[in-house]
Amino acid sequence: MKCALVTGGSRGIGKAICKKLAEDSDYHILINYNSNKEAALDTLKQVNEFGNTGEIIQFDVADADAVKNALDSWMSNNEGSIIEVLINNAGITKDGLFMWMPAEDWHNVINTSLNGFYNVTNHLIQKMLSNRYGRIINMVSVSGVKGTPGQTNYSAAKGAIVAATKALAQEVAKRKITVNAVAPGFINSDMTADLDEKELKRMIPVNRFGEAEEVADLVSFLASKKSSYITGEVININGGIYS
């Protein structure tokens, strides 16, 4: 059984990615969630509606032991299965000016977005190398490419993943493993629900926020064999802002 794992797959962009992979591929979809089991089950239901299979898998990406235990348990119960596609989507924001930022807000964002990338990817990379195939797609952000005031912690985490994407891509390319990053701009989701879209869209050349499904379309392509000559890239999907 060939599988695709989407961390933070229960809501928002992660949910849209799970659904699009179910529509476009034959992968068994592993929907990771941390605490919202109800949302994860709803995503699974919609995956099944595409005629595809999937399951939910609970762990906090920031907790290295939890990641190891959950993935080792899954692998022991699914011998012969391989996770070919990894979408590192889980992340949190704790916005505020750096001068007033509590250490907790800094470390929580770094632990989830950056250390979470390490915890999951490092645990799966050996299997991909042995299998001589893989797709790793890291969800970053315009904040990680440009830097966003009020999001120094988030910008630092995502910026580090941008650099890690480029480095790791070069390390594993000969084994037919591609590593790319997708950098969304303003996308309609829980993370942007409190933003003033009317004001902000004036900055965006296409004059609107993006949709999670548009991001999922790009991710699905990068997860496919059609993208085999693309690696180490950061692809912006932002309506032209900051271009």
Predicted regions and their residues:
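Alpha-helical segment proximal to the catalytic Tyr-Lys
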Residues: 126, 170-174, 228
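C-terminal substrate-recognition "lid" of short-chain dehydrogenase/reductases
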Residues: 133, 211-237, 241-242
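Active-site helix of classical SDR
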Residues: 121, 157, 165
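Residue(s) in the substrate-gating loop at a strand-loop-helix junction
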Residues: 141
